[in-house]
Structure formats: C-alpha cells, structure tokens
Amino acid sequence: MGRKWANIKEKKASKDKTNSRIYAKFGIEIYVAAKSGDPDPHSNQKLRFVIERAKTYNVPKHIIDRAIEKAKGTGDETYSELRYEGFGPNGSMIIVDALTNNVNRTASDVRAAYSKNGGNMGVSGSVAYMFDNTAIFGVEGKDADELLELLMEADIDVRDILDEDGQAIIYAEPEDFHKVQEGLKAAGIEEFTVAEIEMIPQNDIQLSGEDLEKFERLIDALEDLEDVQKVYHNVELED
C-alpha cells in the first residue's frame, strides 16, 4: 500500500509545478459539477467533492468561486466525462480520465499521445479490471491507530489505515468518501493532504532504462493534454 501512496504523492508533486494548468483543470471540473445540479456545495455532493480535492492542490478560493459563478449563468457549454484505457512499455497499464467539450478532439489527442510515445490504446475494460476504485485521505498530526479508533467509534468502516511519510493514509470504499470525510470533520479534522477517489493498481510493476524513459514521456504527454483530468497507472515510481 505504501508504494501506491508514493505514486499518488509523486503525481501531486509533479502537478504542483504547473499550478496554472492545475487551476484551469479544476476550474472546468468545478464548473461541470456546479452545472450538473445546485451550485451550492452544501446540497451538491459532487461539487463538494471536487472542491475538497481542489483544496488539497491549493487551488485559490477566487478560482473556485469564479467557476461556480460561471455555472450560475445562462451558458450551455456541455462537457462529457470520458475514460480511455491503454498500455505503455513492457506491461504497463494506463487509465486516462478526461472532461471535454469536444469528444473527437480529445480522442484524437489521447490516441496521438499513446502512439507517439510507445503506447497503445485499448478497448473499454481492457485495463480497468486490474485497478480498484478507492477513496483516499491523508491526515497529518494523527497516527493510524488514533484514526482507526476514531472511525470505529463513529461506526465507519474503511479498507486500511497506514502510517506513511509522517501522516496517516486512509483507504476506503469510494461510495463511503463523504461518510469518512464527515466522520473525520466531526472529530475536528478539517485539513487533508489528499482527499481523492483514485484508481489504485492491484499490482505494481517496475520499469528501468529505456522502458522507464518511454513510460515517463507517455505519462507526461497524456497529463499535458488540456482535456485530461487524471492519469492512473501501475508503474512503481521512485520518490
């Protein structure tokens, strides 16, 4: 499980280097969530989830507010949520989640990123079955035993809690994301280093040499695409 957290941590660290791009992607995601229902996060669970995620990436409040205000307007811009599955070098598996207002453009861009960087797009379901959809929370200032006791007292079940890198990492069922989060907040835990629903690989693989270089180029190319929101994979990366 530690390696899985290391991969998530590495992904967050790499994205922190391109704040403007991250802010733009969250702006779209917040807009879509607000447009899909009530633009009030207190009554719109999907919107509340996206905002909580955005906070762990230090997205400024004015960007969040601007996206919500835009959703309150009369614009009818439509976005589609898409998932692409594929393969990289030497058994590596990749899942790409996108949010787009132009499906043809996004499909073409993702396919080109795969083909130009030694990968191949697969059909729906060709990769996802090797990943588990998982709610993940990172909490500083508490250890795993403390959080386990806290959650047990609140009658909240989770998959696992581990101490990693000076913080406790909680793994739970995706449908329990809000239940776990509200339980933690009721206990006075308001800040999270991570608050995500991630596709976690059931097994990690290691790459080296040219295979690793090709894989990293492929991941960079996919994450750089305007419409791509998340990229998951099964490669163990170094901290």
Curated annotation (Swiss-Prot):
GO CC list: cytosol
The protein's name in its UniProt record: Probable transcriptional regulatory protein lmo0369
Keywords on record: Cytoplasm, DNA-binding, Transcription, Transcription regulation
Family: Belongs to the TACO1 family. YeeN subfamily.
InterPro entries membership: Integrase-like_N (IPR017856), TACO1_YebC-like_2nd/3rd_dom (IPR048300), TACO1_YebC_N (IPR049083), Transcrip_reg_TACO1-like (IPR002876), Transcrip_reg_TACO1-like_dom3 (IPR026564), Transcrip_reg_TACO1_YeeN (IPR026562), YebC-like (IPR029072)
Subcellular compartments: Cytoplasm
Species lineage: Bacteria, Bacillati, Bacillota, Bacilli, Bacillales
Any one GO BP annotation for this protein: regulation of DNA-templated transcription
GO molecular function, one term: DNA binding
UniProt organism field: Listeria monocytogenes serovar 1/2a (strain ATCC BAA-679 / EGD-e)
Chief location bin: cytoplasm
